Amino acid sequence: MIVATGVDESSLRYRGWRVVLACFLMAFFMFGFGLYGQGVYLAELQRAHGWPGTLVSAASTFSFLLTSVLVIFTDDLLARIGLRSLILCGLSALGASTVLLALMQTPWQLYLAYALMSVGWTGMGTVVIATLLNSWFDRRRGLALSLAFNGATCGGIVLVPLLLSLTGSIGFRSAMLAATMVMVLLVLPVVVGFIRWPAGLPPASGERPADGDAPAPAHSRKALLANAAFWTMVLPIAIALLAQMGFIIHQVTFLEPLIGRASAGLAVTIMAAMAVVGRLSLGLFVDRLDPRLACAASMTSQAAALFVLVQSTSPTALLVCCAIYGFSIGNMITFPPLIIQREIGASSFAAAMGLGTSISGVVSAFGPGIVGLVRSLTGDYTMAFAMCVVLDLVAAGIVLWRPGRRAKLAAS
């Protein structure tokens, strides 16, 4: 709950927008290096060292699973070492990871680099960003989250092509070192200058109580796991992300035989661009919408786009379907913090975000493998993507189930 001070959150003078800028840059580099850049590392490390793709891919999987474990403890880390220290620790770990990726010579260094990347995710990833912005915004919370998380998509659109271009001109090692230096020069000043809790905020909780109100007691992860509102938010998001990750990873393989490599690449670009548009569009209205209803609508639109996609051969229709699908892919990480704030409460926000992100991360990691397995068993992607359609519709149905207007958690 935001302090009732009458502050105009729409004003550009509001300090919270500086925090949004810092979070945008954090998401830009964290997702750029930590997610979208992994395809670059796979190709370049294989080329430089002759390592098998399975070795690098296994390190990537290890990193995502380790991240899913570490983010569970985000609320404990915020209470123990503080917000700014946690973010600076994440920045240092990510920087060390990218430098090590540039300089490594042996496979054990590869796994160390990816372990450091997991620490980076813990300090600069979704949970910290959502918890921080939740404390600064009330009426414009959805817009703030949408703008900040657009940094994630922009990291894929800008940083990855830049890395590829620099690698072609100055080599992978120099490209990674240069990009790391730019990250530190851009992110470090805004973290030191802008990142802080709002005045009067209990630093361990991330909650801002209303005037005259004491903060609600925080609740344990065990209590969250027994809470129906938590599960009707986490399960549908995890299911939708499983289907989403499965489609995204297999998108080019599916489209290339139908429309060619160049057009398949264009489809990926269109989808990424529409993710930015979708986040911005949602951010303008989501604070006036029911987040569960908006989430269900996004999942249904993805199901509809996939349903048409698997039945089409027209290049135009396929590109339009990818655009429609892309419109909602970025919003799957915007809805959980909005639902948590409304139904579980600010005192348990960081704990709920960490636990929910961990669960959805583990579940969604199986998406590419499941889609690939169904494709191998059936010979094409029709049944695999039809499965994704069903999963999206099931997720939309679950997220509309409301166990109560506000979660009632048992005392820790």
Annotate each predicted stretch with a short phrase.
Residues 92-105, 301-313:
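C-terminal ends and interior cores of transmembrane alpha-helices
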Residues 18-53, 70-74, 160, 246-252, ...:
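Extracytoplasmic
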Residues 343-378:
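A late C-terminal transmembrane helix in Major Facilitator Superfamily
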Residues 271-275, 279-281, 286-339:
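C-terminal transmembrane helical hairpin of 12-TM major facilitator-type secondary transporters
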Residues 115-150:
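Cytoplasmic helix-loop-helix junction between adjacent transmembrane helices
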Residues 38-42, 225-280, 284:
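Extracytoplasmic gate region of multi-pass secondary transporters
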Residues 70-82, 279-290:
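Helix-to-loop junctions at the C-terminal end of transmembrane segments
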Residues 152-199:
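Helix-loop-helix hairpin linking two adjacent transmembrane segments in secondary transporters
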